[in-house]
From Swiss-Prot:
Protein species of origin: Acinetobacter baumannii (strain SDF)
Record-given protein name: UPF0102 protein ABSDF1354
CDD domains listed in its UniProt record: PoNe_Nuclease
Gene3D superfamilies on file: 3.40.1350.10
InterPro entries cross-referenced by the UniProt entry: Restrct_endonuc-II-like, tRNA_endonuc-like_dom_sf, UPF0102_YraN-like
Xref: NCBIfam families: PRK12497.1-3, PRK14674.1, YraN family protein
Pfam family, one: UPF0102
Amino acid sequence: MVVAQQLGQWAEQTALKLLKEQNYEWVASNYHSRRGEVDLIVKRGNELIFVEVKARGQGNYGQACEMVTLSKQKKIIKTAMRFLQRYPSYQDFYCRFDVICFDFPQKIAKTVQQDFSKFHYDLQWIENAFTLD
C-alpha cells in the first residue's frame, strides 16, 4: 500500500504542476468533508475546477479513469457543494469537474522508493468529465 500512496502523491503533485503550466491557480489540495474528498481545487478566471487524480500501474485491472465510478462522482460533487457552502466567495464561479489520469504500462516494484517520473506513462486529462446532472 505504501507504493500506492507514493504513486498517488506523485500523481497529485504532477497534475498540479500541469494545471499551473496551463495558468490555473491552486486553491486547495485534498479537501475533505464528511461526504468525501477532492484531490485538487484550482481556479482560472471565474472558473473553479474540482479535479480527481488517478494513477494505476500495470497489473491493476482497468485504466485509471475507469476508477472514477458514478458513486465516486457523487461523493466529489457533494464535497464540492460543501466547499462552496464553506467558502461563499466562490459561489458565483462556474464549476467544472475534471479527471486527470496516469496509466503506467509497466509493473511498478512494491518494495522500492520510486521516482515515478522516470517511468513511461500515459496521461489523460478529461475536462468536464462529469456534471451535476
